[in-house]
Amino acid sequence: MASISAASATATASTKLAYPYSPSSSSSSSNTAAVFPSNSSKLILSSSFTPTPSTLFLHSPTTTPSTTHPRRFTVRAARGKFERKKPHVNIGTIGHVDHGKTTLTAALTMALASMGNSAPKKYDEIDAAPEERARGITINTATVEYETENRHYAHVDCPGHADYVKNMITGAAQMDGAILVVSGADGPMPQTKEHILLAKQVGVPNMVVFLNKQDQVDDEELLELVELEVRELLSSYEFPGDEIPIISGSALLALEALMANPSIKRGENQWVDKIYQLMDNVDEYIPIPQRQTELPFLMAIEDVFSITGRGTVATGRVERGTVKVGEIVDIVGLKDTRNTTVTGVEMFQKILDEAMAGDNVGLLLRGIQKIDIQRGMVLAKPGTITPHTKFEALVYVLKKEEGGRHSPFFAGYRPQFYMRTTDVTGKVTVIMSDKGEESKMVMPGDRVNMVVELIMPVACEQGMRFAIREGGKTVGAGVIQKILE
């Protein structure tokens, strides 16, 4: 239990920067000075839910950096209503560490800003957490927004480092499509494969590939070989490798050109044109998802903030249905189910009358204390989902070559089960083969049915997917076949 709460505390801390909803300084205990040392980084946040900006001291969840640099981030209050003029798509960058995911994200916002379709974000604004500064790698999941001529995008810059695959699972679960970034100079690497596998597991339906660092590859044939290797790799994970668009370019040279001249138009710089070409392909290849707006409302909670005098804000992606101000919702999972009224809805610092499936929003909840609600719970239309601790699932256990276990496991095995934004320890009580015969042992590479008992109740339902993790790596993926308790 202690390890779970510690893990969720770390996860909560790690997502703070991605959301523009204000926590209140008074929500921490009165001995703030004792809890947060003076060298903690400081975050100034404000939103339309609160009249004055509040200050939050962010303390790094890891102790690796020997020093932390105090920095201020100011998030402006809501600037009016969010207008639904274009279809909305959730997208994200995935791929190996240092292949250029965050650089590409910055180049995308700068290029589309030059067309008047987004607010430009510099590299350090996206890559903005103490751990990232200390190790030069992206750890947190940052969300930016931009528009093409036809669509509005919410873009998640997914972490690439293997230690932070947990965030990747949460981030990838939010994607309608992905941009896989592969260095043309290095080709596919271990985390490239792990991210493609994770994308398959959590149901990312489509992806477009950006072969980065083209300027570092002298031989055109080498680039073609890397492209061929990427297509074969995608096909091996059951993506349509032969059809997926692959665009080569240099995110860094495009970003440098845009920093030097932010008003560059199409046709004026070959590297910036590659960025436009990438987004043309994303527009064409990644379909607008069919939103599940007709189904009952459900949103998995990713983060929680408290605002004195107003209530508590829960942030996350609306999985299905719609929710309006004034509607009653159930809070389900981990603790006893209770209900509350939604008193405010916000997306990207703008007020919404109604949130619908696919939106990343913050919901202000009446009469709920911050201690009553946590990451991993879900908000849902009353009576439409219930918490469970026991289910039967169809599970694929990864082979050693896929990064899975090297040895078999038996009934009584206790890994972590990742469902939506929840990670809960569970016990495998019964193992059955595909033919329905009880089995004693599961080998890496097996597809089996198993009965799982969770140590805490989680809002789950038939057809829901999950990942199985052990010792910092994914060892299996499954789908719930039947709820038992």
Curated annotation (Swiss-Prot):
GO cellular component terms listed in the entry, alphabetical order: chloroplast; mitochondrion
Region (G1) residue spans: 95-102
Region (G3) residue spans: 157-160
Positions bound to GTP: 95-102, 157-161, 212-215
Location, primary (coarse class): plastid
Single GO biological process annotation from the record: mitochondrial translational elongation
Cellular location(s): Plastid, Chloroplast
Region (G4): 212-215
Molecular function GO labels: GTP binding; GTPase activity; translation elongation factor activity
Pfam families: GTP_EFTU, GTP_EFTU_D2, GTP_EFTU_D3
NCBIfam families: EF-Tu, PRK00049.1, PRK12735.1, PRK12736.1, small_GTP
Similarity comment: family membership: Belongs to the TRAFAC class translation factor GTPase superfamily. Classic translation factor GTPase family. EF-Tu/EF-1A subfamily.
Protein name: Elongation factor TuB, chloroplastic
Gene that encodes it: TUFB
